[in-house]
Each structure stands twice: as structure tokens, then as C-alpha cells.
């Protein structure tokens, strides 16, 4: 079956060694180019830059730094829950599961899940799905630390990777979507994303998703306006990336990080505020951009949820809720669901 998957879905297989292989589409229609997306998003009435563009090498390093900041509660509270799951999650698993992660990580969170699998299985199969080829780098770090680990990476969109997995074999999957990335979706896009996950799941598969919870406004706003200004640097770095990769002339001194909590829509809204009237050339996007003083470029939404809303959302998509875990302070949640 594995050979037919490669042929039918036009994937090329790369074998690194006996424990590491990955699949990559021969050709992909997955995304417009960076230049095209930037041109389209910066010519709308509400100018925006998609949050996926934060994560170049420097942006990824800054985000790792954000995760350890005292004000940034999501990472440490999710880790607290994952530690709790060391004894509770095995009740829902058996030796026939493999671990599938949307995104690739050598982080402590991925390792906490792998630790659970080491207690259940002699051989652990881990399938990270990530559009970035950093996937191979993080995989090698994990293989160095887990003797019984075998990794099959899929370098594709989440949707493409899950379709690939559907046709790969009949093994049961525990699919992870950790962190609070789901909160970056609009309500409609988030619902559509969950529908795609649900339709890609087989009977017996499980899905574990992290969702940030509604809480005190001061806690929320402090998490995105840290005292060391790392989040501000992270936000501004996307302009540096556009300068470097798209031959643009953004002057970062003329922009300021701006993050507020929108209580009505239950979301943090992150922007770059123009401090002056200014013109910017983005050569590779064939764009001449004019920004007025105080005009905002939207860079990220991060939606927050009530537990009742999580239940309603997941069941409305067609999931059966197995369990919802919270940290002791009820700041963050991990929900385990199956296909109904």
C-alpha cells in the first residue's frame, strides 16, 4: 500500500536511515507565494500579514523565547496538563496507536507525549506533518533521545498530510494539535479546519487539541505585551523578513507593536501601528504601499474559549468528547475527542 500512496498522491519518499524517512509532494499547489500573499493582504481595506509568516529562523527563535517568559502562561500551563496526562492518557490508548503531530516539534510537549508511548509500546511511530523542512532537523534531535522511535515526516500542509495518512495504512492515530494555534483561525476557518480533521480521521483515531481559555483581561494582555518586549520584537520581525525576502524597505523604527484584548469577540488582537505617514516599496510583490499615521496592520488574532464553548464547538463538528483536561488555575485546556 505504501508504494501506491506515493504514486497516487504524487509523493516522493526520502529514506535518511532505518529510523527516519519523510515524504514530500513532487509538485504542490498548496500556497500562493510569499510575495503574492503579502501583496493581496496588504492591499485590503484592513491591511494584514498572516501569522504563519512570523516563523522564519529568527521568528521561531523569538517565539521559543516568548514561551519561557513569566507573563506567557500558555506554554507552562499546557505542560502542566501534559504532565497530568502521563497517568491519565494511557487509559484511552493501546499498543496499536501511532503519534501524529500537526507541526513538528522537538519541544518538551512532544517529548511528554512520546514518554507516554514508551510505556505502551516497544516501537514508537511518530508522524510529524509540517510544511517547513525544519521537520527533519527536529526529528534528528528526537531520534537521538528515543531508542525505540521511528519517524515518518510528511512535508505538506496539515490537510495534505492527513489525506496522505488516510491512505497510508490502517493503524490508529493519536493526532496532536498542541499550543494555542487553533485560536489564530477565524470562527469560520476554525470550524472548517476541524471538519477537515474529522473527515480525515478513521474510526478509532483520537484527536488531542489545545485551546486557551477566557480569563482576566490583565493576564491576557500581559501575555502579549511582556515587560522584556520580546513579543514586540517577534511582531516587528515579520517586517524584517519581508525586507530580506521580498526586497522591501520597511523602517522598523516607524512601527510599534500593539496588542489588546477584544472582550466581545474573546480574542487578543495583535497589530503593527504605523507611527508616521509613510510609503513602503515591496519590490518582489510589485507593491507600493502607503500607510497613514496610526494605521494598523493586523498580524494575529488569538481566540480564547469558555469550556462550554469548547464542548459545543467540538460536538457541532461531529466529534465525541472523551475528556477535557484543565490546568489547576483553569487557564488552558486539552481536549481529547474521537470521530462520532
Predicted regions and their residues:
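Substrate-binding/catalytic lobe of Class I Rossmann-like enzymes that use SAM or dcSAM, i.e.
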Residues: 221-303, 311-317
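N-terminal auxiliary segments of SAM/dcSAM-dependent transferases
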Residues: 2-52, 60
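A short, conserved alpha-helix within the catalytic core of class I
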Residues: 184-196
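Core SAM-dependent methyltransferase catalytic element
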Residues: 274-275, 326-340
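Conserved beta-strand signature within the Rossmann-like core of class I S-adenosyl-L-methionine
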Residues: 199-214
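Conserved SAM-binding loop of SAM-dependent methyltransferases across substrates and taxa
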Residues: 106-121
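Conserved class I S-adenosyl-L-methionine
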Residues: 96-105
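Class I SAM-dependent methyltransferase Rossmann-like catalytic core
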Residues: 46-91
Amino acid at each position: 500500500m505504501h508504494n501506491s500512496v506515493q504514486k497516487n498522491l504524487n509523493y516522493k519518499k526520502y529514506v535518511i536511515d532505518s529510523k527516519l524517512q519523510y515524504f514530500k509532494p513532487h509538485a504542490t499547489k498548496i500556497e500562493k507565494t510569499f510575495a503574492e500573499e503579502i501583496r493581496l493582504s496588504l492591499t485590503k481595506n484592513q491591511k494584514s500579514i498572516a501569522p504563519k509568516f512570523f516563523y522564519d529562523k529568527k521568528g521561531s527563535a523569538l517565539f521559543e523565547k516568548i514561551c519561557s517568559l513569566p507573563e506567557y502562561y500558555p506554554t507552562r500551563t499546557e505542560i502542566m496538563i501534559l504532565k497530568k496526562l502521563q497517568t491519565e492518557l494511557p487509559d484511552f490508548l493501546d499498543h496499536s496507536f501511532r503519534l501524529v503531530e500537526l507541526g513538528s516539534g522537538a519541544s518538551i510537549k512532544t517529548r511528554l507525549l512520546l514518554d507516554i508511548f514508551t510505556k505502551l509500546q516497544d516501537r514508537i511511530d511518530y508522524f510529524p506533518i509540517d510544511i517547513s523542512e525544519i521537520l527533519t532537523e527536529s526529528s534528528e534531535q528526537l531520534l537521538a533521545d528515543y531508542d525505540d522511535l521511528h519517524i515518518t515526516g510528511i512535508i505538506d500542509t496539515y490537510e495534505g498530510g492527513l489525506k496522505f495518512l488516510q491512505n497510508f495504512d490502517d493503524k490508529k492515530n493519536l493526532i496532536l494539535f498542541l499550543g494555542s494555534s487553533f485560536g489564530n483561525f477565524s470562527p469560520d476557518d476554525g470550524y472548517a479546519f476541524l471538519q477537515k480533521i474529522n473527515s480525515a480521521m478513521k474510526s478509532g483515531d483520537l484527536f488531542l487539541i489545545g485551546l486557551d481559555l477566557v480569563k482576566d483581561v490583565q493576564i491576557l494582555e500581559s501575555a502579549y505585551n511582556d515587560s522584556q518586549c520580546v513579543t514586540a520584537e517577534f511582531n516587528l520581525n515579520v517586517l524584517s523578513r519581508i525586507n530580506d525576502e521580498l526586497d522591501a524597505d520597511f523602517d522598523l523604527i516607524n512601527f510599534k507593536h500593539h496588542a489588546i484584548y477584544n472582550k466581545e469577540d474573546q480574542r487578543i488582537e495583535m497589530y503593527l501601528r504605523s507611527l508616521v505617514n509613510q510609503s513602503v516599496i515591496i519590490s518582489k510583490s510589485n507593491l507600493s504601499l502607503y500607510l497613514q499615521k496610526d494605521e494598523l496592520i493586523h498580524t494575529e488574532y488569538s481566540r480564547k474559549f469558555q469550556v462550554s464553548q469548547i464542548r459545543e464547538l467540538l460536538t457541532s463538528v461531529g466529534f465525541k468528547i472523551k475528556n477535557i483536561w484543565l490546568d489547576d488555575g483553569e487557564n488552558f485546556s486539552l481536549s481529547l475527542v474521537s470521530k462520532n
